Amino acid sequence: MPRYGFHLSIAGKKGVAGAVEEATALGLTAFQIFAKSPRSWRPRALSPAEVEAFRALREASGGLPAVIHASYLVNLGAEGELWEKSVASLADDLEKAALLGVEYVVVHPGSGRPERVKEGALKALRLAGVRSRPVLLVENTAGGGEKVGARFEELAWLVADTPLQVCLDTCHAYAAGYDVAEDPLGVLDALDRAVGLERVPVVHLNDSVGGLGSRVDHHAHLLQGKIGEGLKRVFLDPRLKDRVFILETPRGPEEDAWNLRVLRAWLEEA
C-alpha cells in the first residue's frame, strides 16, 4: 500500500519533533519537512533533545517514512561561490537526515550544466559521509530557461552509475510536457524506460495550475488542477505500491481535509 502525507512545518518550540506529532495527529503514513529555512543559507542546529524526541516519536508511530527537502536556494548547476554554498547546504541536509534517521533527501537540480549538478550532488554525499542512508533523490523540474532535469532522459544521465535516485513530481512532469492527465500510465512507462521505477522511491503528488507543457511550476490541490483524475492512476499504479507520496500544496484545515478525503477514497476504490 502506498504511504502518503504532507510537507509539514518545523516552526515552533518542538521543531522537527513537532512535525512527527502533526503527522500522527492527521493520520498520515509519511511526511516531508525542511531541515532549515528553505530561503536562507544559515544552518539550523538540532539539539540532542530535539533529535531524541524526533526519533522516539517516529518509533512510537511505527516508523513513518520521512523525507527532507533541500533548500530552495540550492543550485547544483551553478558555478563559483553559489555552487560551493549549494553543495555545503545540501551536505548539511544530508547530515541532519542521517542524524534523525530520515530515509530520503530531495533536491532540485537547479539551472546550468548537468555535469555540475551531478558533480555537486556526489560531492555533497562525500562531504556528509553518506554511504547508504539517507538516499539522495534528484527531482524532475518543470523546465524553462536553463533548468536541469525536465526530461526523464536527463534524469537518467544524472543518476547513472551513482547512488543517486529520483523523485517524481507530477506537476513538474505535466508542466514539462508529460501528459499525466490523459496518459498517466504512459508517463510512468517513459520514466521506467529512462530511469527505472525501482529508482523512484518518492513521488510528489501535486496537481497543476498550469497547462500541459506550460513550464509553470504552480501546484494545485488534488482534483483542483489540470491533471485531475490522472493522479489517481499514478497513486494506485501497482508498480508504485510501496512508494512514499507527498503533497506539496498550501496547508490549512479545510485543504488538508479535502486532500486526505480524496486520497482515502482512492485507496478504498483500489
Swiss-Prot record:
Reaction(s) this enzyme catalyzes, per UniProt: Endonucleolytic cleavage to 5'-phosphooligonucleotide end-products
Record flagged with keyword Cell division: no
Ranges in a coiled coil: none
Binding site for Zn(2+) 3: 172, 217, 219
Matching CDD domains: AP2Ec
Enzyme Commission no: 3.1.21.2
SMART domains in the record: AP2Ec
One of the GO BP terms on file: base-excision repair
Summary of the function given for this chain in its UniProt record: Endonuclease IV plays a role in DNA repair. It cleaves phosphodiester bonds at apurinic or apyrimidinic (AP) sites, generating a 3'-hydroxyl group and a 5'-terminal sugar phosphate. In addition, possesses a 3'-5' exonuclease activity.
Protein name in the entry: Endonuclease 4
Origin species: Thermus thermophilus (strain ATCC BAA-163 / DSM 7039 / HB27)
